[in-house]
Amino acid sequence: MKKILCFLMLAMPTAGLAQEPGQGLDHQLILQLLSRIEQLESEVRQMKQAAPAGTPTQSSAPFESNPAVSTALAATASAGAAQAAAATTHELSVPGLQPVHVQGFSDVQYQASDLKGDYNSFGLGQFNLFITNRLSNKLGLLGELVVESDLNNTVGVELERLLFQYTANDYFALSAGRYHTAIGYYNTAYHHSSWLQSAVGRPLVFAFEDGGGILPIHNVGLSATGRLPLSKLGLHYIAEIGNGRASRTPSDEAVQNRTDENNGKAVNLGIYSRPQGIPGFQTGFSLYRDSLHPEGIGKIGQTIFAGHVVYQQSGLEFLNEAIVLRHAVQGGGVFHIPAFYSQVSKRMGEVRPYFRYEYMNVPRAEPLYSDIGLRHGPVGGLRFDFNEFAAYKLEFFRDMERNVKSNGLRTQVSFTF
């Protein structure tokens, strides 16, 4: 059954999987589906072994007997989307038009720490509506609408992704609109849904812009992806150009959705490999370049180097990424911001323990993000999946800064609908 499923996935007209923003089946969806299949097949084998001789057994495969999982795969494939999870999508049909598929995600969490001045709080996570529409065999639409609250308890609505997609073949696919920049691995493998990821939150270096993140997580422009031909290494390329991140004042909206603050454009180039002989393994590198123009500082040349090595197979998750931001101030100095994280987890039935160590060090004299300074520490926790639709997570963390150290816990219920 798994061989048939994998063949169907590979036969679909996409230009790669989750690492290619907005194209094809989401890589995390496939891993979750295959993991669930393995678990169900194991349960069926145990039941067959325990059944008395002569007792009839059901011949259908466990994947086919699980309508939630099989429906998710069918819905995702027909929509040409990249972030559907292992649950049914909701179809909205209008006579004469292609059906629109809607998938929902959200979470509720609680956090407490011993940091002075920090208050333990319950909090609403992002309410995420993932929308896809297939216009033809080669054309599709993808939207991601998020409702969330900020630190001032104000609820707002933001269009996190909006893409018009053209897929010529496995070697070329082009998206136009607002996308998740393909810097490293995590940003295009895990989108706006905590349910998809093992831990409660994202790694420190991949925090969203409105949450204090230093990377240009979102961009508005063009993104091209595809597979390189004649390669047993499973090589894929990424080429993106967009407005880049706003930099004039800290109060500006970080994502330049409508107007660019200058005529220069941000460019991101990347390449990654998924060797055929090592299922679940991926390694890659990307280079991002932009010019920033903060008031009172002058032009800053920004270069972001990112590399990753990940392995996800048979319930094992091993993620490793290193990133260096280089800021060259015109007529001034050059500053480097190193950051990395390493995360490992292992699924054992419905339980997945995980551990992550993360690090970021912003120089004291760095002109843009010196308020962040040095931050590093471990995060360890446990994820328990109630079923294919809901999960509970409990994690403990230690946050170490230059002059402050704190300990705390986070707990979360995340779900898809």
Give short role names for the model-derived ranges:
Residues 18-110, 417:
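N-terminal periplasmic/intermembrane-space "pro-region" immediately following the signal or transit peptide
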Residues 240, 244-258, 288-294:
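Active-site-proximal beta-alpha loop/turn segments in soluble metabolic enzymes
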Residues 116, 154, 162-167, 175-178, ...:
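Outer-membrane beta-barrel pore domains
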Residues 256-264, 300:
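Interfacial loop-to-helix transition and helix-capping segments at the boundaries
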Residues 86, 112-113, 202-209, 251-255, ...:
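Extracytoplasmic loops and strand-loop junctions of Gram-negative outer membrane beta-barrel proteins
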Residues 4-13:
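Sec-dependent N-terminal signal peptides
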Residues 89-247, 263-268, 272-278, 343-354, ...:
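Outer membrane beta-barrel
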